[in-house]
Structures are given as C-alpha cells and as structure tokens.
Amino acid sequence: MGYYDIDDILADGTRFPCRFNYDVPGLGYLEGNPGRPISKNAKLELPLWMVHLLAVVGAQSNEDSRVEEPLPFVELLPPDLFAPRVLNAIKSGATSLDLHSISPHFYTLAEKWATLFSDKELSQVLKDMLLERGQEINNHAISVSMFSNCNQTNDSAVFLQTLDEFEKTIYRDTNVNCKEMKKWLVLK
C-alpha cells in the first residue's frame, strides 16, 4: 500500500455509512441540499478517506462543556461489508466465498477498518481467511504454471473471478515465481 497505489486509492473511495454528531453549516450538498446545513444525526455514506478524517477530528460543543475529549464530527456505522453474516460466511468456509462480489478491495478495507477501531476479532478472522485462501491461491497458481490443460485453465479462470485485488496480486506473484523456479531448475 502506498501513496501511488491505485488499489489503495480505489479502496479509499469506497463509501461507508456514518452519522453526523453536530449540525454542520454549508455541507448540505453532501445530502443533495446545497446551501443548507447537515443536521445532527443525519446519516450519509461518505468516502473512507473523508469519513476517516471526520471520525478522528473532534469539535468543541457548546452543549456540554464538561466533556474533556471533543466528540468527533461523525460516528462511523458498521458497513454491510463487515456484517455478522459476512463474518460468519468467512468463518464457515473462506475458500468458497466470492470475495470480489463483496468488495474488490476487501482486504484493504478490512485492514483499514480493523486499524481504525482496533478490532481484534476482525483481525483474527482476516488472518485465518488469508491463511485458508492463500493455500488455495497457491494451489491454483502452481497448477496453472505446471499444467496447460484447458479444463484446468477454465477452473482457474472461475476461481480468479472470486479473488479480491490483493489476492490477485498474490496469485500473479506466485505464478510468476513458480515459472521462474521451473526455468532455474531446467538450467541447473
């Protein structure tokens, strides 16, 4: 992940649900009401890069001056991406899950979410899923480079459509490294 990584940029553009904790003047255009304020408790979906900043930065409220730590501008709401049904599906069989249909940047978003909220359960689920799916990715990448059977290639094409962008990178790297290893063994 880096500043110029296109997958990271696309992941940061993913919209997440949030609720405003304050009336904010002049931001009504986010709701489709230009020139009007966003009212307190208004629910919107905003890009992750914006929500992250608004969820971390707080504002001084005139309502309760005794509060030591200012309340952030927005409260992030749990997205469907990390709903209990999705996490249960991952736990029950990560290899059979079509991760790309859930989100093309699932791992990147999950990593950012787990970091933002220090979500240990999500981190553990991600770790277990990556280990389980990583073995399957490795098996497919090696079998494609070892065998050029048409039926094998069709199975791998279907499998590749279920991978998110991070997993596709792992697949490509594994496939290239396996081919390079075969070349090296032939030369030796």
Curated annotation (Swiss-Prot):
Cross-referenced Pfam families: PSF3_N (PF22466), Sld5 (PF05916)
Function: The GINS complex plays an essential role in the initiation of DNA replication.
UniProt subunit comment: Component of the GINS complex which is a heterotetramer of SLD5, PSF1, PSF2 and PSF3.
Family: Belongs to the GINS3/PSF3 family.
Protein name per Swiss-Prot or TrEMBL: DNA replication complex GINS protein PSF3
Top-level taxon of the source organism: Eukaryota
Species for this entry: Kluyveromyces lactis (strain ATCC 8585 / CBS 2359 / DSM 70799 / NBRC 1267 / NRRL Y-1140 / WM37) (Yeast)
Entry-linked InterPro entries: GINS_A (IPR021151), GINS_bundle-like_dom_sf (IPR036224), GINS_Psf3 (IPR010492), GINS_Psf3_sf (IPR038437), PSF3_N (IPR055221)
Locations listed in the record: Nucleus
UniProt keyword terms in alphabetical order: DNA replication, Nucleus
GO biological-process terms attached to the record: mitotic DNA replication initiation
Disulfide bonds: none
GO CC annotation, single: GINS complex
